[in-house]
Amino acid sequence: TPKKKLLIDAGLAGKKITGLLAEIDRKPEDLDAILITHEHSDHIHGVGVLARKYGMDLYANEATWKAMEGTKYLGKVDDAQKHIFEMGKTKTFGDIDIESFGVSHDAAAPQFYRFMKDGKSFVMLTDTGYVSDRLAGIVADADGYLIESNHDVEILRAGSYAWRLKQRILSDLGHLSNEDGADAMIRTLGNRTKKIYLGHLSKENNIKELAHMTMENQLARADLAVGHDFEVLDTSPDTATPLTKI
C-alpha cells in the first residue's frame, strides 16, 4: 500500500529476491517488514540476509521463532527487529489490517494471512495438506486469493521422489494438489472474488498449464464463470508477478 510495503516470506536467496523486486520497480530497502509463515527453508532462505542488510522488521509466531533460531537462514538478527505475530490475531500495519490463521502443515506452527484494507481483502493460502470447513470459513469471500496448486497427484506418484516424501506431500500435513486447490476455491470464493492466483507449484511434480486447466475446469463444472466474474492467474518463482490492484 502507499503507507506499508510488506514481503511475505523470503524463500529465495537475497540477491534473487532483489532482482525480482527490480522487475516490478521496487527495492528491498523500501520494504518495512517480512511476515514469515513457517520455518521451512523454501520460505526463509533469504530472511536473515535481507534483515541484516536492510534493517527490516521480521514477524512470526513464537513457535516459528523458536524453530528458526540457530538456523543458517536466520543467522544473527538484532532482537529489535524480531516481533511476535501470534496465530489467530489481527495486526495493523499502517493502513492495512492483517489477520493470521493456522494451516495443516508439517512445521512448528504454520500460519498464513488475510490482508484487509478499505473493505477489500486478499488471502494467501499455501503449504497446507487440506482446507478444513473452519479454515474455509475464515478465508471465505475475499476479493483475491493466492491458492496453492502444488502438484498433480499422478505426476507425483510416478515421479522420482522417495516414497516417504511422496507420502508426506500427499498427507494432511503436506500440500494441496491441483484438484485440492480448485476444491478449496469452490468452497471459499464469493461474489466479490475477482482474482485467483495459483502458487507454490512444484517444478518436479506439476506443469503450469495443467494446474491452470485443472482450476478452470473444476470451477466451470461447479457453474462458476471463469473469465467473466473472475480470472485465474499463474505465478512463478523465477519471474515477478505483475503488480495489480485488488
Enumerate the language-model features and the residues they cover.
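Active-site metal-binding motif and surrounding structural segment of the metallo-beta-lactamase
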Residues: 13-61
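Cap/insert and terminal regions of metallo-dependent hydrolase folds
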Residues: 133-233
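Active-site neighborhood of phospho(di)ester-bond hydrolases with catalytic His/Asp-centered motifs
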Residues: 7-11, 32-39, 59-62, 123-127, ...
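Active-site environment of divalent metal-dependent phosphoester hydrolases
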Residues: 40-44, 65-67, 107-108, 131-133, ...
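Short, conserved loop/helix-junction motifs that constitute active-site signature segments
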Residues: 26-29, 50-54, 77, 137-141, ...
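Metallo-beta-lactamase
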Residues: 62-112, 116-119
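Conserved beta-strand hairpin/beta-sheet module of binuclear metal-dependent hydrolase folds
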Residues: 1-24, 111-127, 144
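Metal-dependent catalytic neighborhoods of phosphoester/phosphodiester hydrolases
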Residues: 45-54, 69-72, 206-213
